[in-house]
Amino acid sequence: MNHFELFGLVEGFELDTRKLADTYRQLQTQFHPDRFATAPEREQLVAVQRAAQINDAYTTLKTPLRRAEYLLSLRGTDIRGEQQTLQDTSFLMQQLEWRERLADLKGEADPEGAIKDFRQEIGHDHQLLMQQLTLTLAAGDDLIAADCVRKLKFVDKLLEELERFEDSLFES
């Protein structure tokens, strides 16, 4: 049984997050290990394993990039944990520009304003990539969708680094 089936959801990138959360709570209650405290040891073990499976499936499905990776793996394109580099030269150049810009933020006269502008720019590109990911997954174009996931991982990492940089400004 795959994660979508476990939660009674149609297999796809777009999903009903309310149904996901509601079903998660129901399954958590149904298979919580405490409910099996007086059951035979074998049933307790099954309950613990099932609870772990439910938690993992929920975390995977509620997180868009993890959901996309999982969906791609179900379709035969497993990119989870891969270290493949992108072949998209323009995106690679964009990465370099963003990295330089992040490094240059330290010398800005108004770092807070520069961070805000930079975050908006990256957020806009993130949104465009998410739209492309949604469309390519719906169309079954898994190779392009996999590239979108790779790009989104980079953008997410850059946003995390920007957040850490911003935090360091306030710690000084």
UniProtKB/Swiss-Prot annotation:
Alphabetized Pfam families for the sequence: HSCB_C
Gene3D superfamilies per the UniProt record, alphabetical: DnaJ domain, HscB, C-terminal domain
Protein name, as recorded: Co-chaperone protein HscB homolog
Keyword Chaperone assigned: yes
Originating organism: Aeromonas salmonicida (strain A449)
The J domain, residue ranges: 2-74
NCBIfam families: hscB, PRK05014.1
Any GO molecular function: ATPase activator activity
SMART domains the record matches: DnaJ
GO biological process: [2Fe-2S] cluster assembly; protein complex oligomerization; protein folding
Job of this protein: Co-chaperone involved in the maturation of iron-sulfur cluster-containing proteins. Seems to help targeting proteins to be folded toward HscA.
Keywords for this protein: Chaperone
Entry annotated with the keyword Transferase: no
Domain of life of the native organism: Bacteria
Family recorded in the similarity comment: Belongs to the HscB family.
GO cellular component: iron-sulfur cluster transfer complex
Record note on quaternary structure: Interacts with HscA and stimulates its ATPase activity.
UniProt-listed SUPFAM superfamilies: Chaperone J-domain, HSC20 (HSCB), C-terminal oligomerisation domain
